[in-house]
């Protein structure tokens, strides 16, 4: 909409492409577009419904990233180059976790918006999801697969925290749109910057095998109190203890004890191991991606 965020960006002098899914906001946005000399471009669509897994033509408000970036005039850059475009938005609360997973799969596969390089996301997310994204081992309720994968993939920076009381969050039926969180604090909306790491695809991690890394981490956190050695043995035919020893990780370590960088090192070691039976992941990885989409 033509609110504070849009006007703040325009007042800063940057070129803005507003992707708006609410038809009620389009007239005022288009009026603002017409009053500016090319600084604002308005597109009807939903940024968080980019590249749905459908056959045939994509129907608005869903969008195709190729068409969006062509309209914006943004060309793809090599991964290690500078950020090609900065995205500002608010994650839909009802689908917040699902949206974070979709973006994560796209990041690791260099698909959708990440085909164009290290696209920077500046997004408002709930405080409880921010706590998950930045959690470390020892934070039992917050530390999850999502924590590991976002921290490996991106630099995460908290830019601002705003109390929910600053926003109108009631649904049409009068209920609160923001449910109370039992396990984690959720009193604020957090503006978070997610910048893909330049060195993400160095070493053994590549877009072609990254979906296996994602699924490996998800499998480890399916039972966070299980011994990592037991998990590894099921993938490397009894070679788990040796791999852990090489990485200086105690054989008694639970899957929730490892830091994000430990998971990356472990995956790269598994890739080098001729005992790794990661091929059995393939069908389950594809099914997981379909479910997320």
List where the protein language model places each region.
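Peripheral terminal appendages
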Residues: 2-5, 236-293
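An accessory alpha-helical subdomain
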Residues: 187-190, 194-198, 203-261
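Alpha-helical recognition domains of nuclear gene-regulatory proteins
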Residues: 102, 132, 231, 243, ...
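Alpha-helix boundary/capping residues
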Residues: 33, 137-140, 220, 235, ...
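Catalytic cores of RNA-modifying enzymes
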Residues: 1-215, 278-279, 288, 292
